[in-house]
UniProtKB/Swiss-Prot annotation:
Name of the protein this chain belongs to: Major tegument protein
BP term (GO), one: purine nucleotide biosynthetic process
Function: Tegument protein that plays a role in the inhibition of host intrinsic defenses to promote viral early gene activation. Interacts with host DAXX and thereby disrupts the complex between DAXX and ATRX. Suppresses the DAXX-ATRX dependent deposition of histone H3.3 on viral chromatin allowing viral transcription. Targets also host SMC5/6 for proteasomal degradation in a CUL7 and calpain-dependent manner to support nuclear membrane-less replication compartment formation and lytic virus replication.
Family membership noted in the UniProt record: Belongs to the herpesviridae MTP family.
Pfam family, one: GATase_5
InterPro entries per record: Class_I_gatase-like, Herpes_virus_tegument, PurM-like_C_dom, PurM-like_C_sf, PurM-like_N_sf, Tegument_herpes_virus_N
Gene Ontology MF: a single term: phosphoribosylformylglycinamidine synthase activity
SUPFAM superfamilies noted in UniProt: Class I glutamine amidotransferase-like, PurM C-terminal domain-like, PurM N-terminal domain-like
Primary location: virion
Length: 1318
């Protein structure tokens, strides 16, 4: 989609009115990675570009365009100054210090060179700019036209000033080859683009190849009307759509939280519902593409987990600079997608990363391609829709932000997670406010598409009547600015087509039927409007469905038509026809540029290769190497449902074979017994909660198992066999997962190929083979999506099939992962192959110049292997396990050793040729069993015609333990785990060179992560580290409000934590609070969740300002905070900023009284950005001081415990530098970032154990201890199954984790110190 935004038919009008451009400079800026690289180049005397410069000085540069001139009347100038000050406050300016000021640290002179740059003011605003503009709009600002954050750097030049060659280096390194622009003085004097408008291409059929491929797979003219996917599916689909077949998996334990605070006294219930897995593969894919596609299948789907995968050409080139440029592009593209998902409130639980050399078949023509899968939960009643008909309303949800350069590094125009979060919340609220069928249309095209294509997908018959006054504001403003000569039918049609219909965008489109009756006192449109208002989601009622074909526009700009009048008869001012679908005759695919013949014999010389050198090349390859630069920098656990995310073991290494997402995190009593009466809490104390003996029955957790399988290179070699191998990998990844019934496994295939290089018969053959294979495996099969390279790109040989597994699962004990568990245990391997090098293997790619044909194992042998291992897992014999895939057997063994940090000794038979054995990628498994169980395991496997091999023994634990491979009497490999980990992590280190500052990459502490084994316990808990799971009815005397700010998601973990602690917990949205007595019935207030804005610090300060803007909301919260019988807790970045901004924590003063305005500028602290400059998702040690005043942490005083810490700004920076000492003396420090030791003084001071390296304080409380704000989020780990790794000190716990005590303590405190009422 990159080219769509660059094709323009008519230039968008620049803002030409009077304006003032203000420049503000960051006072505490430091050089970013690109500026550091440039300076190193220019200061290197050996470089041809050397300038002998002085010290590098860099700073942020904020440009603000304000409406008006200096000659405006004084009231206007004062209001303009107030709004400019508001921008500074939102970006960190305070009364005691300014982060942005009018004085620059740089001065341009004869010897100084100063360079300013940033987003292009002549193009659409950046995503960051659009989001701050949205905040300003919510806060009532009218004078701020546009805000952009740029950069400025400079240095003294001792010799000649920069020449053309130096400017080329600046353009490449700093401007990303003109993705950003150099700022010259007076550059925007003639005007700038204010509107979020991008012209789209004027094409009759924008995606003919994509349409053709979907017709092949899912039926249509090209396939003779046959529904091939329907014929081959193994399960009965609910219905067929252009986007694929929909297969739902039922569940009876779906968490449902009441939306409105006035709902019944039971705010939570477990309901029947469905789980649906969806996905797609797209070249240059929009970061959040699947988040919009899923509502196109089920409009009220709630995304609960996602998965990401990437395909790239191997970073090659004629020189080091070309390779570095390719690596940088890949690093920024993947980072942009990871951070967009990190801000969406939906955890990423699975993924992959594959590179293919351009010289290999499959690498030629490969564009950056992303897979995005999503797991959604759907309430049973949310499946009901109404029949499409005329007279239905057309709705567009979300701000209109056309795509332009979404994936072009450094990705300033990446998608807005805020917009997508608001849309999802709005739909969720809409389904609750109007619980009756009303949506009649919601289908979407199968790929990134123009608005006109989306509208065409919604309309099965007739057309649409659209009203110009109801179009998005930027489009409407552009129409209003057209002069009389252009404001004609053809002129307006051209403008609307260019800037509304032809661009691709991120909006969700639906049609709704306006029912005659009201529900809950509201009509459909009133309920939708209320839902969008509460969610902070922009929405547009564009028009209605009509019998007249095409898009018929009514010019009502002078006299806008109301929504009630849209059903009247109107004459169109102009009409735009839907793009005609071109009929194409049969054509043969373009001949391939490479030899089609496949050699069946390898061309490498094995005697010249050593195991050690081959293993080094394999482990450092991007396909096999660590993906920590992705996994640790995106959201993994938001919402609290994730029982298994990618990280495993004491080092949190991304090696998990499968993910497990729970359907509910709310406790129930064993055996379905009813909950205890809430009066049970009257007899309870913290001591009783920790002293009770754990029950004998383990708690069962129900959910969905998710795995991925893909073999992109092997699919390119042989579509049929590669597809089967992808299915085999996905299935074996789930072999050690706690699946309830193997027959419930659902395989969903997502196909990506170029129709110009393959024909219908090849696709049909591959799909038929996949269907036959699934039958042989005994699993269900469906086809999810079909995609192809972008239109206009060169033909590509790259083909891939991503197979995803989803299956109902349940566990009650530790999950089986690749983490080796026990010294002295044995490792057993079972493979479906002959031990020879697999065609298309990574070994073959690296060491052979001939590609051989891959071969998938027989379905029966794979089925037997899967079911046998499942049987062994359920019997409790298997201690750990890992699948054999990319890199072969030796890679699997190394990864298991690294995951468990245990030495391994492998013995290969003397008669065997060990090198092919080690690197063969035939599907199989390695699992760990105790020596006493080996006989039983071997007998079980052999009884099913499998031939297992005992490979070796597990050694002691420790980073200096050895990984050995013995071939008879000869030791052919012996390396320490520390050295192997460095090799395996080398690819991630290369990526970090592009993503993190040099001072972090070169820090001696950068690898000091994990090993959170040594725990300190409090006098209260003693050695009993597993508190009691007390399941009671919700206590109406302890009602807790979870405050949901606009643009936030992921509150479920807070709701569940307080519900499990016996509280009656409800969500409260800002716009619900209409008087200052609203919170009087509550004794607890919780603030958390994930805000979708790219700038976390900005989002927090803007949220406080938004609270202050609504007096009823502000006074209700301040009244609550000042009541002596209440408590509050704020978790994560947003929560800490809100509670500190309201004056509850961060100082020794009390919060302001109701009626007093909250001054955001007086906040005692601001959040410090992470030292890495990246989003962090870390499992870190947190210590609670023994003297803290916090009432919620009373039971954990003196503890050192691991906890999830996620965010972009995970440090506290106080405006008063002496405040930390004041708070410490007042016992208002709630917790610290801690090292891996137990001593109370061993705080973490360095990244990554201390994400920002700005002090070590991770939490604060109020002077009386009632209010608590933590940067970590204990609600994400109240149960042990939510923990990344359970240290041995806990043994095999059956209760809940110690973090539960803080929520239970809040309940007990409210009963003893509050004024609880029924």
């Amino acid at each position: 989609m990159e080219e769509r935004g660059r094709e323009t038919q008519m230039p968008v009008a620049r803002y030409g009115g009077p304006f003032i451009m203000v420049r503000l400079f960051g006072q505490d800026g430091e050089a970013n990675i690109q500026e550091e690289r440039l300076y190193e180049l220019l200061s290197d005397p050996r470089s041809a570009l050397g300038l002998d410069p002085g010290p590098l000085i860099a700073e942020n540069l904020l440009l603000v365009a304000l409406r008006g001139t200096n000659n405006d009347p004084r009231p206007q100038r004062q209001e303009r100054a107030r709004e400019l000050a508001l921008v500074g406050i939102l970006l960190g300016n305070g009364e005691q210090g300014e982060h942005l000021g009018t004085e620059s640290a740089l001065e341009a002179s004869g010897n100084n060179y100063v360079y300013a740059y940033g987003p292009d003011w002549m193009a659409r605003p950046s995503t960051w700019s659009a989001e701050i503009q949205q905040f300003l709009r919510l806060l009532g600002a009218t004078y701020v036209l546009r805000v952009e954050m740029g950069r400025q750097f400079g240095f003294e030049v001792h010799r000649s000033r920069p020449s053309f060659r130096q400017f080329q280096a600046i353009n490449h390194l700093v401007l990303f080859d003109n993705a950003l622009r150099k700022y010259d003085s007076g550059q925007v004097a003639a005007g700038f683009q204010r509107a979020l408008l991008v012209a789209g291409p004027e094409t009759a059929d924008t995606r003919p190849d994509l349409r053709k491929l979907n017709e092949w797979v899912f039926g249509g003219r090209a396939a003779g009307g046959r529904q091939l996917a329907d014929e081959l599916k193994i399960v009965s689909a609910l219905r067929d759509t252009y986007s694929g077949h929909l297969v739902l998996q039922p569940t009876e334990t779906l968490d449902t939280w009441k939306v409105l605070s006035r709902d019944t006294r039971t705010a939570h219930s477990l309901e029947h519902g469905f789980i649906h897995a969806a996905g797609t593969i797209q070249a240059n894919c929009p970061q959040l593409f699947m988040r919009r596609q899923h509502p196109g299948l089920f409009p009220f789907v709630n995304a609960i987990a996602s998965s990401l995968g990437w395909y790239y050409q191997t970073a090659t080139g004629p020189g080091a600079d070309a390779r570095a440029a390719a690596r940088r592009q890949q690093a920024f593209q993947t980072r942009a997608a990871a951070e967009c998902h990190a801000k969406s409130g939906v955890p990423v639980v699975a993924g992959f990363y594959r590179t293919i050399n351009a010289t290999l078949k499959g690498g030629e023509g490969l564009q950056p391609t992303m897979f995005n899968g999503e797991l959604g939960a759907i309430k049973h009643q949310a499946l009901d829709t109404v029949r499409y008909d005329y007279g239905h309303y057309l709705i567009m949800l979300g701000p209109f932000q056309p795509w332009s350069g979404l994936t072009a590094p450094p990705c300033p125009y990446a998608e807005s997670s805020w917009a997508q979060a608001a849309v999802q919340t709005a739909l969720e609220l809409f389904s609750a406010l109007y619980p009756a069928p009303c949506i009649s249309g919601y289908a979407r095209p199968p790929g990134p598409s123009a608005v006109i294509e989306h509208l065409g997908s919604l309309v099965p018959k007739g057309g649409l009547l659209l009203f110009l006054s109801h179009l998005p504001d930027d489009v409407k403003d552009g129409l209003g600015e057209m002069g009389p000569a252009r404001a004609t039918g053809p002129g307006m049609q051209q403008f609307v087509s260019s800037y509304f219909l032809n661009p691709a965008c991120s909006n969700v489109f639906i049609t709704v039927r306006q029912r005659g009756e009201k529900i809950n006192g509201r009509t459909v449109l009133q309920a939708l409007g209320r839902a969008c208002d509460m969610a902070g989601c922009q929405h547009y009622v564009l028009g209605s469905t009509v019998p007249l074909g095409g898009l018929n526009f009514v010019n009502d700009l002078a006299s806008p038509v109301s929504t009630a009048e849209m059903m009247d008869d109107f004459s169109p001012f102009f009409t735009v026809e839907f793009p005609p679908i071109q009929e194409e005759g049969a054509s043969s695919p373009v001949p391939l540029d490479v030899d089609e013949s496949m050699d069946i014999s390898p061309s490498y010389e094995l005697p010249w290769l050593s195991l050690e050198s081959c293993l080094t090349s394999i482990l450092s390859h991007p396909t096999v190497g660590s993906k920590e630069h992705l996994v640790r920098h995106t959201d993994r656990v938001s919402g609290g449902r994730v029982a298994q995310q990618p990280g495993v073991g004491p080092l949190d290494l991304p090696l998990a074979d499968y993910a497990f997402v729970a359907h509910s995190q709310v406790w129930t009593r064993p055996g379905g017994a009813p909950p205890l009466p809430y009066r049970t809490w009257d007899r309870m104390t913290e001591k009783l909660l920790v002293s009770a003996k754990p029950g004998g029955e383990n708690v069962k957790v129900s959910g969905t198992v998710i795995t991925l399988g893909e073999q992109g290179y092997k699919v390119s070699l042989d579509l049929r066999e590669g597809t089967r191998l992808a299915m085999a990998e996905a299935l074996l990844n789930a072999a050690c997962a706690p699946i309830l019934d193997p027959e419930d496994v659902l395989l969903t295939l997502h196909l990506h190929l170029d129709p110009r290089r393959a024909d219908n018969s090849a696709v049909m053959e591959a799909m038929t083979a996949a269907s036959d294979y699934a039958r042989g495996l005994g699993v269900k099969l469906t086809f999810g999506s079909a995609s192809c390279p972008e239109t206009g790109s060169s033909a590509s040989n790259f083909m891939t099939v991503v197979a995803s597994v989803s299956a109902p699962g349940e566990f009650s004990g530790p999950l089986i992962t690749p983490v080796l568990q026990k010294t002295g245990s044995l490792l057993i391997a079972v493979r479906c192959g002959d031990g020879k090098i697999q065609g298309g293997s990574l070994f073959e790619q690296l060491f052979s110049d001939v590609a051989t044909t891959p071969r998938a194992p027989e379905a029966l042998s794979l089925k037997n292997l899967f079911r046998a291992v499942q049987q062994l897992v359920k019997s409790g014999i298997v201690l750990s396990g890992h699948d054999i895939s990319d890199g072969g057997l030796v890679t699997c063994l190394v990864e298991m050793a690294l995951a468990g940090q245990r030495g391994v000794t492998i013995t290969m038979p003397v008669a065997s040729d060990y090198l092919p054995e080690m690197f063969a990628e035939h599907p199989g498994l390695v699992f760990e069993v105790e020596e006493r169980s080996v006989g039983e395991v071997l007998q079980t496997l052999r009884s099913m015609n499998m031939y297992p091999a005992v490979l070796g023994r597990v050694g002691e634990q420790g980073p200096d333990q050895m990984f050995e491979v013995q071939h008879g009497p000869e030791t052919v490999l012996r390396q320490s785990l520390r050295l192997l980990l460095g090799t395996w992590s080398s690819f991630a280190s290369e990526q970090y060179e592009c993503l993190r500052p040099d001072r972090i990459n070169r820090s001696m502490h950068v690898s000091d992560y994990g090993y959170n084994e040594a725990l300190a316990v409090s006098p209260l808990t003693g050695k009993n580290l597993s508190p009691r799971r007390l399941v009671t009815e919700p206590d109406p005397r302890c009602q807790v409000a979870v405050l949901c700010a606009p643009g936030t998601r992921g509150h479920e973990s807070l709701l569940a934590a307080f519900t499990n602690a016996g509280c009656l917990c409800r969500r409260v949205f800002f716009r619900e609070v209409r008087d200052n007595t609203f919170l009087d019935k509550y004794v607890g207030l919780a603030i958390g969740g994930v805000h979708g804005a790219r700038d976390s610090a900005l989002a927090g300060r803007a949220t406080v300002a938004l609270i202050n803007r609504f007096p009823a909301l502000r006074d209700a919260i301040l009244k609550f905070l000042n009541r002596p019988d209440t408590f509050s807790v704020a978790l994560g970045e947003l929560g800490v900023q809100v509670l500190a901004g309201l004056g509850a924590v961060g100082s020794t003063d009390n919060p302001p009284a109701p009626g007093v305005e909250v001054n955001v500028q007086r906040s005692p602290l601001i959040l410090a950005p992470n030292a890495s400059g990246m989003f962090e998702s870390r499992w870190l040690n947190i210590s609670i001081p023994a003297t803290t005043s916090s009432v919620m942490l009373r039971g954990l005083r003196g503890c050192v415990l691991p906890c999830w810490v996620q965010g972009s700004c995970l440090g506290l920076q106080f405006t008063n530098l002496g405040m930390p000492y004041v708070l410490q003396n007042a016992h208002q420090i709630a917790c610290h970032f801690h090292s891996n030791g137990t001593d109370a003084w061993r705080f973490a001071m360095n990244y990554p154990r201390n994400p920002t390296e700005q002090g070590n304080i991770a939490g604060l409380c109020s002077r009386d201890g009632r209010h608590l704000a933590l940067l970590c989020d204990p609600s994400l780990c109240t149960d042990f199954w939510q923990w990344e790794h359970i240290p041995p000190a806990f043994g095999h716990p059956t209760g809940c984790s110690p973090w539960t005590l803080m929520f239970q303590a809040a309940h007990l405190w409210s009963l003893r110190h509050g004024r609880p009422s029924e």
